[in-house]
Amino acid sequence: MNEKVRIGYPPSRVWGCPTTAMWVYRLGAEKAKQMLFTGDLISGTKAEEIGLIFQSVPLEELDATVNQLTNRIKGVPKNQLMMMKMMVNQAYENMGLANTQTIATLFDGMARHSPEGIWFKQRAEEVGFKQAIAERDSGDPIQGSKK
């Protein structure tokens, strides 16, 4: 990932829940809560530092870095790659990934149909999506939310 890219999940402030739930598995509970409770964006450098991504590099090095990694991986026999992928995926399944993703999908739908979610949709219709996003991501309290 480019070190200057910003990554996060701003819809966690209102109108969404990340359905993959990978934040918890990649970051642990505390950092995942911080990211999701605030909806803040972080740089690629910070994302690497906290373990959200594998590596961040300057934009001008991105293609070469990706090519180097893919060339390294493609030298491994396919059956070996398949077994390693299945083993890692099974470990996530054993930790409850599928169940977590199911409930996250339900919560995503609920978030979009909550009073705050409905307010956000109506606000976007009134002022346009770009302005509604700017208001949501400003850090100010969400209108109509129950505190």
Where do the PLM segments sit?
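Conserved catalytic core of Hanks-type protein kinase domains
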Residues: 26, 38, 75
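Short Gly/charged-rich anion-binding patches and loops
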Residues: 18, 42-43, 61
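Short aromatic/basic micro-patch
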Residues: 26, 41, 56
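CoA-thioester-processing core
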Residues: 1-35, 65, 69
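C-terminal alpha-helix plus adjacent terminal tail
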Residues: 43-44, 75-147
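C-terminal long alpha-helix characteristic of the crotonase
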Residues: 1-5, 12, 54-102
